[in-house]
Amino acid sequence: MPMYRSRTSTHGRNMAGARGLWRATGMTESDFGKPIIAIVNSFTQFVPGHVHLKDLGQMVAREVESAGGVAKEFNTIAVDDGIAMGHDGMLYSLPSREVIADSVEYMVNAHCADAMVCISNCDKITPGMMMAAMRLNIPVIFVSGGPMEAGKIDIDSLDAKKIDLVDAMVAAASDKLTDEEVQHIEENACPTCGSCSGMFTANSMNCLAEALGLALPGNGSTLATHSDRKQLFLEAGRKIVEITKRHYEQNEKGLLPREIATFEAFENAMSLDIAMGGSTNTVLHLLAIAHEGKVDFTMQDIDRLSRKVPCLCKVAPNIENVHMEDVHRAGGIFSILGELSRAGLLHNDVPTVHSDSMGEAIAHWDIAVADNQAAKDLFKAAPGGVRTTQAFSQSNRFKDLDIDRKGGVIRSKEHAFSQDGGLAVLFGNIALDGCIVKTAGVDASILKFTGKAYVCESQDQAVNDILTGKVQAGDVVVIRYEGPRGGPGMQEMLYPTSYLKSKGLGKDCALLTDGRFSGGTSGLSIGHVSPEAAEGGTIGLVEHGDTIEIDIPNRSIHLAVDEATLAARRAAQDEKGWKPVAKRKRKVSTALKAYALLATSAAKGAVRQLPDDE
């Protein structure tokens, strides 16, 4: 039977000093012997997805204590990708994932905590904490801050519709809108606390936490502002004590992260991601999380799943006027998982933190089949329509649920948006280890695209050349040396894709990069090209005017240059060194250099790899 980790610092004469310090934090004699639960919070006033989390850690802590545990809270950093976007701040976003994972490991191992409740929300925070959870392999429950309510606009020059952050970015670069109209969109795009309202990276990852079995039902879709979300936090506090005692005191199996998030669970999570057209960043993060848990889940597995899982749900930015609040009304993640299960595309026998099996959980929480009033009540939680930064500030209810699986927000396999899923892996001579495209956001007319390369040595150059009209219809904009090492930090390319839209080129151009894309990206945007240019990838050999052939249905991408020419270019590049032609105006700090030194390519999740970690 496993012993509580915390006994290392709470028992024995040699730990008198440690116990003295524990007492100074408020612990008493009766607390020594109880499980110590780390409340891993990520509150910050910099990020709307985290601004409301300040008091929630202590709310969970009180619940832990009532259930018989000892709760100790600490905080991690949290970078807002939207605020860091478009300048050198974005260099820090992906590396912050590793910092978060390390900081959680440092705190939990240094203080010998027995279990964790991870309070995350936005882009790199959830995956960073998940990496730590798989690395530590102690009982854990994830509970996120929840999605933001969608913004709403109604102005003369635009149709009345729901909006989000990406709409504000596109509008700002459009010459068809007045300054006043742009300001109106800006003021209404992000009306409440929470993670941005579409199926962007943050919400995608919080949904995947449900599919991995590490979060409670409703985690990915219950709005940050709704009072129902409070129950998720309270239940997380109670449940973590229960499963911690079952693990340590009863030696019960199937309760640790690596026993829950198995290979089959990763297949479930990826199938969900493909079915809902989630962010391409989730590929990067799932690979990294699997790596930490020593799960052999690869790009080849993702490619295999992408060929058989249909697109069952389209959410902004892949479709207008559908946001996370609409997914919630349609039954949330367990309704999508239910449709996958009925299509024979889900592993139903994997455990979760709240149920013995995924199949059992679906039977209880999928509103299309479950006669469960609690589920029906949960998924009626509606937006409040009032600007606020406060969690649980409203209790509005939808009058009815969306259970239309023919034409609703969530579809059955028979009535899918497409039988081809929302994400695809492409391979070819320009991406020998693969690259990723969110097919749910690609217009059907350009699933096959051949164009001339317009090469940019940085995101900054691409933005300038798009806005100044140098990029023309038919171009494939190639942005290189923006990978994990080359950036360093693998920046998101949301501004270039948004500006292509604003210039009316969204269906006339492709964008190809060894960097990555925001979850807010749509269009023919292909990222994660591996190997990256800085590692000697073929993307570093592309020249202006080269023909690039993209064939999504056949999962291929090809640089139409003969092998002899490529070999000559490679020899020349080897001699010059794999770096941008012109020196970039970019300050690369010691911290970023350290990340770049160890970072792997996107095909391996951009994790750090030591020489003995091969």
Curated annotation (Swiss-Prot):
GO MF annotations in UniProt: 2 iron, 2 sulfur cluster binding; dihydroxy-acid dehydratase activity; magnesium ion binding
Pfam annotation, one family: ILV_EDD_C
EC number: 4.2.1.9
Transmembrane feature ranges: none
Binding positions for [2Fe-2S] cluster per the UniProt entry: C122, C196
Cofactor binding remark: Binds 1 [2Fe-2S] cluster per subunit. This cluster acts as a Lewis acid cofactor.
N6-carboxylysine: residues carrying this PTM: K124
A GO CC term assigned to this protein in UniProt: cytosol
An annotated GO BP: isoleucine biosynthetic process
Keyword annotations of the record: 2Fe-2S, Amino-acid biosynthesis, Branched-chain amino acid biosynthesis, Iron, Iron-sulfur, Lyase, Magnesium, Metal-binding
Pathway: Amino-acid biosynthesis; L-isoleucine biosynthesis; L-isoleucine from 2-oxobutanoate: step 3/4; Amino-acid biosynthesis; L-valine biosynthesis; L-valine from pyruvate: step 3/4
Keyword Metal-binding (UniProt): yes
Top class in the EC scheme: lyase
Record field: catalytic activity: (2R)-2,3-dihydroxy-3-methylbutanoate = 3-methyl-2-oxobutanoate + H2O; (2R,3R)-2,3-dihydroxy-3-methylpentanoate = (S)-3-methyl-2-oxopentanoate + H2O
Positions of the catalytic residues: S518
Cofactor(s) it depends on: [2Fe-2S] cluster; Mg(2+)
InterPro entries documented for this protein: Dihydro-acid_dehy_C, DihydroxyA_deHydtase, DiOHA_6PGluconate_deHydtase_CS, ILV_EDD_C, ILV_EDD_N, IlvD/EDD_N
Binding-site positions, Mg(2+): D81, D123, K124, E492
Domain of life of the native organism: Bacteria
KW Zinc (keyword) present: no
Family statement drawn from the similarity comment of this UniProt entry: Belongs to the IlvD/Edd family.
Subunit structure: Homodimer.
Function of the molecule: Functions in the biosynthesis of branched-chain amino acids. Catalyzes the dehydration of (2R,3R)-2,3-dihydroxy-3-methylpentanoate (2,3-dihydroxy-3-methylvalerate) into 2-oxo-3-methylpentanoate (2-oxo-3-methylvalerate) and of (2R)-2,3-dihydroxy-3-methylbutanoate (2,3-dihydroxyisovalerate) into 2-oxo-3-methylbutanoate (2-oxoisovalerate), the penultimate precursor to L-isoleucine and L-valine, respectively.
Entry-linked NCBIfam families: ilvD, PRK12448.1
Name of the molecule in the record: Dihydroxy-acid dehydratase
